[in-house]
């Protein structure tokens, strides 16, 4: 049994800006896995940090934990225009992931936000909550054990799903459903169909493609992810997600690119490469788990 003192000690690592960012990320994911009020309190306190990357990951983890106790803090972040768009976006997505309809009115209001990534996120979260109300239950569990912003489409033909995915005239929710169906199907054709989505018009959509490709860990999409990370014209939110995907795929073909962009002028890209290089080492090393905060306490 993990004690509250141990949770608090892991929280201290998370909240210590003097610690290397990869160590703080590992502490965060340990807290996510442990759950409970003390873990949530530590995570919420991190929203005062200066790193948009870390704050966005805090919101992501709170959404994946699906604990209603996080709702007030996430609402505060979503409504705080001083927070970076990628942080507000992740707070909106987390509110959709938790799945409590009490936040619908706020999400509908922010579906008109002037920051397009925030508006699109809240539109998706509203549709997810409406889908849950219509179907009365969560979609079947993801093979990746993640809570996704849209349930997977029931279609299983890769070409049909690719057509929906890339159809800019379709509602974003439908395209996301195609995205998660392709991810769940897996295989080279599905990976390449998803990688084509990195050319889509919506930065939010492109960033989600990067995230999904990172989950799949298939080397077939390394050239497309590398091109997106290398593009200075690309939205930093997309570049960051592509960097982390390369760290997750963790093949030698990813390493040189991550090292090159670990000095990028965009802080979120720089930090993402730092975290991705740590993930690369984990994927290629002997460590039992990435979320190793408890092991570090006992070392």
Swiss-Prot record:
Keywords: Hypusine biosynthesis, Iron, Metal-binding, Monooxygenase, Oxidoreductase, Repeat. The keyword Oxidoreductase applies. The keyword Membrane does not apply. Its cofactor is Fe(2+). Its EC number is 1.14.99.29. GO terms for biological process: peptidyl-lysine modification to peptidyl-hypusine. Pathway: Protein modification; eIF5A hypusination. SMART domains: EZ_HEAT. Fe cation 2 binds at residues 89-90, 207. Binds 2 Fe(2+) ions per subunit. GO terms for molecular function: deoxyhypusine monooxygenase activity; iron ion binding. Belongs to the deoxyhypusine hydroxylase family. This is Deoxyhypusine hydroxylase.
């Amino acid at each position: 049994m993990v004690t509250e003192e141990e949770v608090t000690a892991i929280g201290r690592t998370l909240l210590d800006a003097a610690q290397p960012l990869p160590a703080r990320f590992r502490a965060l994911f340990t807290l996510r896995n442990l759950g409970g009020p003390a873990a949530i309190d530590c995570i919420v306190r991190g929203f005062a940090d200066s790193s948009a990357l870390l704050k966005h990951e805090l919101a992501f983890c709170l959404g994946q934990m699906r604990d209603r106790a996080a709702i007030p803090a996430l609402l505060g972040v979503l409504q705080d225009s001083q927070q970076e768009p990628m942080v507000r976006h992740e707070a909106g997505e987390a509110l959709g992931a938790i799945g409590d309809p009490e936040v619908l009115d706020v999400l509908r209001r922010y579906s008109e936000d002037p920051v397009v990534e925030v508006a699109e996120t809240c539109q998706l979260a509203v549709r997810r909550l409406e889908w849950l109300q219509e179907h009365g239950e969560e979609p079947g569990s993801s093979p990746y054990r993640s809570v996704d912003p849209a349930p997977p489409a029931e279609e299983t033909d890769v070409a049909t799903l690719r057509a929906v995915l890339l159809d800019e005239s379709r509602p974003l929710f439908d395209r996301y459903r195609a995205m998660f169906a392709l991810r769940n199907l897996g295989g080279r054709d599905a990976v390449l169909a998803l990688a084509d989505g990195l050319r889509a018009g919506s930065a939010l959509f492109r960033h989600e493609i990067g995230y999904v490709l990172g989950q799949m860990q298939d080397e077939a999409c390394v050239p497309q992810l590398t091109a997106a990370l290398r593009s200075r014209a690309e939205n930093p939110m997309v570049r960051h997600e592509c960097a982390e995907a390369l760290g997750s795929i963790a093949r030698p073909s990813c390493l040189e690119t991550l090292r090159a962009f670990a000095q990028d002028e965009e802080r979120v890209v720089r930090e993402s490469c730092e975290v991705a290089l740590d993930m690369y080492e984990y994927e290629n090393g002997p460590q039992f788990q990435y979320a190793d905060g408890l092991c570090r306490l006992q070392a």
